[in-house]
Amino acid sequence: MDKKIKLAIIGFGNMGTGHTANIMDGKCPEVDLVAICDINPKRIEFGKEKYPDANITYFTDAIEMLDSGMIDSCLVAVPHYDHTKYSIECMNRGIHVMCEKPAGVYTKQVREMIAESEKHPEVVFGMMFNQRTNPVYRKMHELVHSGKYGEIRRTNWLITNWYRSQAYYNSSDWRATWAGEGGGVLLNQCPHQLDLWQWICGMPVKVQSKIKYGKWHDIEVDDDVTTFVEYENGATGVFITTTGDGKGTNRFEVQMDGAKLVVEDDKLTVTEFEVKESEFTKTNTEVFGSIKTHNLEIEIEKTNPQHIGVINAWAGKILHGTPLIAEGAEGLKGVILSNAMHLSDFLGREIELPFDEDLYYEELMKRVATSKKKENVTATFADTNGTYGGAKL
């Protein structure tokens, strides 16, 4: 019998349920799901009813499960504040860990998690950045980093197809609260795009944001964000997102010295310049001269494995030493971006990176202190397929 990892899942909510379904459907052939933990007894009963013949042991205490000796790997899919807590508990026991996005709520706790992982090199630590498996973004990353088109001039990402109604925010007592979730659209939906943005374009050095909290919904946290950034080479970028647009847009544009790259409607368009702009502007003699361009035919892989691909790559790393989709330490960069965006709006000014992480934590805790606990909320769970807001094939 081929060797498999012995997996546990902590958190049997929307994401944990989705991962379980993929594994039980046989889409992760090197994964044996042996344990599931959730503090809600109703979720345990749901699992037993859904998979009555499965050899899965259920727990309501995560530490008891981690100490059971049954598992060698764990997928952490709990509310955001506890991502680092349970990932560290896994590392301390030599258990391989896959952390759902975001890596944490604030950078200080993510740095602690990464520092702990460095003490345990035997542990395979991965991040659930499933959009890195999307072939259009992988190709965009390849082209931007090839050096063929020179430096980035400008980046723009309009990612407003994250629409959520009030029912979504009412589905859990922790959701969309400072104390329970630690943020809104930036921390819940946009970790995917913030990761891709920095993965493809690099990290900015300055951030300035205008954020609205509960603009479109009855919530405490952000549901409308406009951010301006500057990069070390002088390039600029804009990032706009919301969960309030009834019909949103997902358009990511990177303007370079020698080309323009756009991802929209699940397609990558590359407009190549016959002469780089930096050369053309110096040598052109026509008053209204313009650069000649042509569109490239870009061959894109047809497979887009998303969460399944991330889990299979993680199992492959554990069993065979093959590469991960995203190392665990990669989770820090997106949290830096979301924290910087929040801090800019909290203080009403531009933020330079690296920023004062203690100050961010203080500002966050002010909001946690006044966060209102939701009363009489019945947890509601739903199929998350098709809700990820990224390009799909």
Give the ranges of each region predicted by the language model.
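Conserved SAM-binding strand-loop segment of SAM-dependent methyltransferases
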Residues: 55-62
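Beta-strand-loop-alpha-helix segment that lines the small-molecule cofactor/substrate pocket
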Residues: 66-68, 73, 79-132, 147
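N-terminal Rossmann-like dinucleotide-binding module
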Residues: 1-52
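Contiguous beta-strand/loop segments that form the cofactor/metal-binding neighborhood of enzyme cores
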Residues: 188, 194-277, 301-320, 324, ...
